[in-house]
Amino acid sequence: MYEFLGILIYFFIALALSLLLLGLPFLVSTRKADPEKISAYECGFDPFDDARGRFDIQFYLVAILFIIFDLEVAFLFPWALTLNKIGYFGFWSMMLFLFILTVGFIYEWRKGALDWS
């Protein structure tokens, strides 16, 4: 039990410091925002439209697809570096992973998630 005491103390100090840093702005900051600070800024001109307008759902779909395939690359790099050590099981596991992602990509493509019309 005593060998984990340092980790426990570190955890509680990190938790206390995190809570302090999260709560400190609520105690120190001003309560009322200036209208100039919350207005949109467009190169020194008055804004033409509301800056907090709605985006098309297509942008969110592309962002989600980007995150999915970005994670694929994040998994592929370590796999490629350790391919000679993990053997056939690691190879076929990654091939299954890539196959599932490819099937998902084809599904998204056929459903029209990538069409901008």
UniProtKB/Swiss-Prot annotation:
Signal peptide: none annotated. Keywords: Electron transport, Membrane, Mitochondrion, NAD, Respiratory chain, Translocase, Transmembrane, Transmembrane helix, Transport, Ubiquinone. Its EC number is 7.1.1.2. The keyword Electron transport applies. The keyword Calcium does not apply. It is a multi-pass membrane protein. It catalyses: a ubiquinone + NADH + 5 H(+)(in) = a ubiquinol + NAD(+) + 4 H(+)(out). GO terms for cellular component: mitochondrial membrane; NADH dehydrogenase complex. InterPro entries: NAD(P)H_OxRDtase_bac/plastid, NADH_UbQ/plastoQ_OxRdtase_su3, NDAH_ubi_oxred_su3_sf. It comes from the Eukaryota. One of its GO terms (molecular function) is NADH dehydrogenase (ubiquinone) activity. Pfam families: Oxidored_q4. The chain crosses the membrane at residues 4-24, 61-81, 86-106. It is found in: Mitochondrion membrane. Core subunit of the mitochondrial membrane respiratory chain NADH dehydrogenase (Complex I) that is believed to belong to the minimal assembly required for catalysis. Complex I functions in the transfer of electrons from NADH to the respiratory chain. The immediate electron acceptor for the enzyme is believed to be ubiquinone. Belongs to the complex I subunit 3 family. This is NADH-ubiquinone oxidoreductase chain 3. It comes from Prototheca wickerhamii.
